[in-house]
């Protein structure tokens, strides 16, 4: 498949994922999955008269695809995530529409692009009108028990421009916290009960999830558990319990690692802290040590995922619980000579996505899907699972048809937005399952606007910008797609937090002098 080739490009090692990776307790599920009880071939949403499924949504922070065995890295240990991949479906072409935590988490919750919900650092909190139609609220209204643990990543406000509050009262069980939260469980006020046994936050969230599952199973009501791990976000703070996992290990660098593989990138992309962090975060001279702590943090998440899945089995709800695992954005980890995230390149914007629906006949086959999906698609996916009609005005589309038909398609393109950081690095890109077009508008102080075009099917490492090559028809096609998203921005952006003027800034046909006036407002 195209996606498998895409992942093999990142590292030289690529493990074979078995068709099924069941524990001993999973054989009953295998039997159940063979029973022809699904009238729907493409989706497994809740239909009238059916028992509503439970939903477990697991979100990490800053996790790149090559931190997992099931995405092609045989040098890391992610047994529970690899088992989830074998039990469910892996999505190889899943992107975040904004590659920074606050906006991406709002994208996920609301099913809307950033310019539609208006929530990000330097802009503002999520407006209550958008939160009111988020998946946690809509599922609770549908009768679901809901729980939230970890880093929710944003606050909710009723007045644009004003500080918001955490939506504590909107969940039946709360284990989340403000801001970035802490790796020290004792510092997370809503999680202090777990601090003695689980002093590091990652395992504490696994324990929280297990406890909620036990409580919800007694209620005989469907539940939705959302767990948002801080890991593997900086500062690197691995759980000491796992210190031996990667002690003394070395790691294969991605084939696009280092500054020499980023010389063709737009000059604008080097003006943010992502460029500085290649050296500042020691990717250049201490790669093995840096990646050992990074992978160690992911390992603790993997343990927590195992705790949650074990609880589903223990309390007899596994066969009716859909598990979704993904990340809010990726991480560059030295690729092209950059660190951190935000930029529209693959390591930053393409993230893991695994979905396991044990009720579906396609489960247990280790299937992969290389159709384009986005983080905004997760909200309508969750709603369809629960049998809830999506509200109007969202940008996402349910992924469930792809679970039934991995060769299908739910969208042709997706915008990749950045309006955070220095204005020089503001960018808007559009991606398809095979191509990516990036536009860098900044033209001040000797700069010129830059176009980048990549064939991500043939060149997944983004080593050749073909915007000035022979692909004229492809370039024009991607320009038209890009212009269409600019038009959407102009028509649908929220009227606050300074989002509407960015439609002018990203318009390829507007003179720089007119864009400067927009930035100065």
Give, region by region, the residue ranges found by the protein language model.
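Active-site-proximal cap/lid insertion segments
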Residues: 49-50, 62-75, 178-203, 212-373, ...
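Loop/turn elements at helix/coil->beta-strand transitions in domains of secreted/extracellular proteins
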Residues: 51-55, 87-92, 142-147, 169-172, ...
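Polar, surface-exposed loop/tail segments
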Residues: 78-79, 108, 142, 151, ...
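Short, solvent-exposed turn/loop segments enriched in Gly/Ser/Thr/Pro and often Arg
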Residues: 70-75, 89-112, 125-126, 148-161, ...
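Active-site-proximal N-terminal segment of extracellular/periplasmic enzymes that hydrolyze or transfer
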Residues: 48-89, 95-98, 140, 461-473
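Catalytic-site neighborhoods of secreted/periplasmic enzymes
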Residues: 107-206, 235-236, 418
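Bacterial N-terminal signal peptides
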Residues: 28-39
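C-terminal cap/loop subdomain of S1 sulfatases and analogous C-terminal strand-loop tails that border
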Residues: 160, 172-173, 178, 329-335, ...
